[in-house]
Amino acid sequence: MILIEDSITNDLYQNCAKELDEKLYEHCWKSSSLNWLSDVKKGVDGSCIITPVSDTIKHLLEQELKSSLPKHRELEFNYYIWQHHAGISWHNDIAHDRAFGATLYLNDQWHPDNGGWFIWEDDNGYHTILPKKKFLIISDNYQHHCVTPVAMGFRCTIQIWGLL
């Protein structure tokens, strides 16, 4: 697991936040719950909606994150909005034809009581990350992890996938 604070510039963060706000009013969203395996969604009520980032934002993210992300020939970038009760139980990403996943947090302020914690397990035990603006988490497709259900607000991220 790789954890990076302030992974992008404030300017790029503002551009991402602006584009996300604009996309909220477009008919471009789909439910990611359709893609999750039933055992992964077990016990989770809410859903998460997704839409691709624009080519412009994708290019800017690739440039700013190129030294942080694993080298990969094809990257996919999507906005995710985790709604009330949305979360995902313990899983890894092996079944999804991905080499790695990365989560870039877009919430400006997030209270611990809002839920949406990213939890992972390794040889040293369990670890948690609260959503924090510009924080980047990178994990390989074998990393066991989950996201606790969102209690309040909307958990906004850019999910980055290194595709196989």
Where are the model-predicted features located?
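Catalytic core of non-heme Fe(II) oxygenases with the double-stranded beta-helix
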Residues: 59-62, 66-164
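Non-heme Fe(II)/2-oxoglutarate
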Residues: 1-70
